[in-house]
Amino acid sequence: MNNPIGPYRTLDLSPGRRIWVNTLELSWPAHSIYGLLEVDVTVARQRLDELEAQTGEDLSFTAFVAVCVARAVAEHKEVQAYLQGRGRLILFEDVNIGLMIEHQAGEKRALMGHVIAGANHKTFRQINDEIRAVQRAPAPANRGMPGWFRSLMLAPWPLSRLFMALLRWNGRRDPTSFVGMGGTVALTSVGLFGGGHSGWALTPTPQSLGLAVGLCASAAMTGVSQA
């Protein structure tokens, strides 16, 4: 017997949301391992605040995280290896970090994909300036996505499923085609969606390695001596 469920509404997803729903589907099926870390960034925040006071610049904390990730991955490049077929791994020498950058579009803020190429060869200042330049530049068409990729992600179901299966197959056949678009490592954060709260961030990613940054929060420290 069907019970009454009460009134409900049906809403159409915007094109942007449809694209991201299908893009996240590209990470399936993936054999993922998740790890939760808590890192003390007190000194880093203090140093950035000091530099901002000296220069008057708005420095990017994301740039600091990107530098740290790039240097760590450069020491263990196997974590950004990609399977080619079923019997070969491709190891990339450069750490190319794919991240989403908040872009001001009129009165709205939109997320746009960007890849910091060769991040392991760049300084904090270089990555910071690259991120700020992307934020200041006029928003590119399709939020930086190739036109063909956007069209595939907006295809009606079940065509979208077929296209995603073909993209996954091509990525396994030639991982360089995917890495050229999304980077070898993914970096994302809760950002503007989680202000005022603390917690963890978990997100699916098509990349072999992804870092999702939660939120900075004050916490009592025990067993720490001050000189």
Model-predicted segments: where are they?
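C-terminal catalytic/motor cores of large multi-domain enzyme assemblies
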Residues: 1-227
